[in-house]
């Protein structure tokens, strides 16, 4: 049975266009934005409010606390279960998000090496005590050909965890399989000038709509996990509340990181084969193109 994946950079209109499509084609939304998995992180993740969802069922949103760490392997299994459930209801699953590995885990049915919480905890503790550079050096001694940024703590720790558990090269994801032929992939792109304006407005709206207060409440309610505390926008708000940076600097840093994220997302999804590329510079024109793609795919006259 067919499913649809809306992918693309932040700011290209995935949430709104997929919502329109789900409304017109009897669909459910399955979130594939890793940060929207977290409860109470609403403003800085651009999570649609319940009223904005227009009654369209949404899955894989608000499923873990910000004190926990999301797992792409667990997410894949949960998302696949959601998709099967939606098909059983004779509805169409719309997988929507810009978190490349999360999308790919479902669309390409990625297979992940095992995990070991005890090993992970030992590595996390060592990184806290000695610095991630020590673990990075060890990783390169074990596997000189493995490429990872010295500051990428999560990937370094995961790579060492895999190496220790399996005794093999620490490739965090097993080789990419061909895209499942039951996924229609719609990659949303946008004119760079338009996207830059959208991202600037997006960041302004975060702060205008109360991101600082949201973060203050999060800190009161939870001991934030590493991922939540380092999320774009949230990291800057935490620094502002700690008196480390000004609000203006927090906004500027959030915008620059958002732009870098968008560029990474564009490069990631560009690699997908067999996709439909839709330019969302004009949203109304884009949706007509999307309707045409879906009508043909589902043979609706």
UniProtKB/Swiss-Prot annotation:
GN (gene name): miaA
Broad enzyme group: transferase
Binding site for substrate: 10-15
Gene3D superfamilies documented for this protein: 1.10.20.140, P-loop containing nucleotide triphosphate hydrolases
Pfam families the record matches: IPPT (PF01715)
Protein's recorded name: tRNA dimethylallyltransferase
Span of the signal peptide: none
GO function term, MF aspect, one: tRNA dimethylallyltransferase activity
Disulfide bonds: none
Alphabetic keyword roster: ATP-binding, Magnesium, Nucleotide-binding, Transferase, tRNA processing
Cofactors named for this entry: Mg(2+)
Positions of the record's site feature: Interaction with substrate tRNA: 99, 120
Example of a GO biological process term: tRNA modification
Keyword Ribonucleoprotein belongs to the record: no
Binding of ATP, residues: 8-15
Catalysed reactions, as listed in the record: adenosine(37) in tRNA + dimethylallyl diphosphate = N(6)-dimethylallyladenosine(37) in tRNA + diphosphate
Organism: Tropheryma whipplei (strain Twist) (Whipple's bacillus)
InterPro entries listed in its UniProt record: Dimethylallyltransferase, IPT, P-loop_NTPase
Complex and partners: Monomer.
Assigned protein family: Belongs to the IPP transferase family.
